[in-house]
Each structure stands twice: as structure tokens, then as C-alpha cells.
Amino acid sequence: LYITLLVTAFLFGLAEVLRDNSAQTLMPSVVDQENLEKANGRMWSAESLTNSFIGPPLGSLIIGVAIYLPFFVDAGSFFVAVALIASISGSFKPVHETPREKLNFKAEIKEGFAWLWAHSLLRPLAIILGCMNGLGTMVGATFILFAQEVLHTSVFEFALLGTAGAIGGIIGGILAPKISAKSGSGPSLWLALAMGPIGDVLIGTATKWHVVWALTIFGSLTAILWNTITVSLRQSIIPSHLLGRVNSVYRFFAWGSIPIGMFLGGGVVSIASQFLSRESALRLPYLLGAIFGTLLFIVASPKLTTNAIEKARAEANK
């Protein structure tokens, strides 16, 4: 049974990556370019709402009826999703600028990697996001221990802490297009980038759980702001026949650092516990995250300007 659960979880993980990449690739085919940020924001708000506020209580209710019933309901939801996708009208085949012969899988991935690496804006964006995610998971790896042993949260308080990310995601999905339109893409990305080290300093020195709750809401909001702008940018400047492949390579850079960050976070606390108090050891990843996050902001922010983003859009639309 354990092996079956592991294999199933692995396959679900693969399917989720495929779904996420396909959804981002499909979006420009059903939404006008000027509405991409609004559409992406609404999609992330809906995902945060259903994943964190509707799904868990509904699952608990269904389990109360029968322990096996959630699996059948979940399976049925996929059939509903397939039917909804099939109801979308239009042609979604990639459009090639010139006729070309079909490439094999390895050559297609290589082509997507080469296109991304040659792009003066998307290449640093992918690397910057990878660094952000690595630092984020470095502090997140031991968050449960931090909440229990440093903030001394009860079970109920920890459950409330868990709602912060979803609340921020919902609000961020709604406000992100408006913030981007009013402040500009560049300053909006600076805000999201700066929130990492600022949040790490404030959380790493916090003594009250509700302070961490509020900071997590704002951090989640700015993360959605970053995603809304950068995903919409990719959708508007990557050629349609390369969008899926370039997105996949981009996500490899962005997500590949996550397990590294988790390993580093656990390692830092484990080693520091031998020389520092337990509380200091659990605070240390946040302080390190703040230091490296500040360095990342100094290096990355000059590349993330509204002019650079608009220039990339203009070149893609020539």
C-alpha cells in the first residue's frame, strides 16, 4: 500500500506540472493580450480559494460519510474538468511562422532551452525566480518547528497561520493587475522582490504568531503579483509554437531550487543547533534569507525595469 501511495503521489505530481504548464500555454489562445494579467490573477484567486478554503472542509465532510468516498469524488471532478476543457471552442495548435519539419522530443526541449537562454530578459527572470524560491523554501523547511517552538502556537493558532497564504493569494489575484497597471511592471516586481528579505527580517525576529500571519498574507500577495506579471509577460512575448517548451524550461529553473532550499534550511538548523540555542537556530534561516535576499535585490532590481519589460513586448510584437 505504501509503494502504491508513493507511485500515485508521484504521478499526480507529474500530472499537476503538465496541467499548470498547459494552462499557462493555453491562456493566450483564449484571452486577448491586454487582458492576460487580469485573467491570470483571477485564475490564481480561484485556485487559492478552492485549494485552501473549499477543498479541505468539503473533504472532511465527505470523509465523514465514507473514508473511501473522497477518492471517487476526486476522480469524478477530473471528468468534469475534461468536459469543461472540451467545451472551450477554438483552435489551439501552435502557429509556426514558416513551415518546418517535425523535431523529436530532445530537439524540441533543446530548442526551448536555447530560446530562453538567448533572451536578455527571460533568462535573468528565470534565474532570479529560482533564487527567490530557493530562499523561500530554505526558511519554509522548518516553519512548523518555528511556529511550535518559537511562536508557541496552539493547534488552532497554527491552523490559522495556514490560512495566511491562501488569503494573500486570493487578494493578490484580484489586486495584482490593478497594482501593476498603477505602479508599473518594474516597481511591482521590485516590491515582490523586496518583500522576501523584509519579511524574513520581520518574521525571523517576531514573537507573536499574528504578526507572522499578517506578514505571510502580504508575502503571498506579492508572490502572486510577481507571478501575474511574469507569466503574462511570457505569454505575450514567447512565440506560440515555443510557449509550452520555453515555459517548461523556465519552470525547471524556477522550481529546481526548491528541494535545494529545503535541504539547506534543514541543514542550517541542524548544524546551528549544536552551537546556538534552539530558538536562535530556528531563527537563523530567516536571517540568512534576509541577507541573501537583500543581495539578490541589489543585483536583480536593475534588470527588472518597466522599460525593459515594455521593450521585450515591443520586440516580440514586431
Describe the residue ranges of each PLM region:
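Flexible cytoplasmic inter-helical loops of multi-pass small-molecule transporters
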Residues: A86-A114, I309-N317
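Residues that mark transmembrane-helix kinks and helix-interface sites
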Residues: V17-T25, S29-V30, P56, A141, ...
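C-terminal transmembrane bundle of multi-pass solute transporters/carriers
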Residues: Y2, A66, K110, W117, ...
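Hydrophobic alpha-helical transmembrane segments
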Residues: Y2-A9, G13, K38-H96, F156, ...
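Juxtamembrane interface at the ends
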Residues: L84-R100, I224-L233, I237-I238
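Hydrophobic alpha-helical transmembrane segments of integral membrane proteins
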Residues: Q24-T25, N51-F53, W255-G256
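Extended non-transmembrane interhelical loops and adjacent amphipathic helices
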Residues: N21-L36, M43, L243
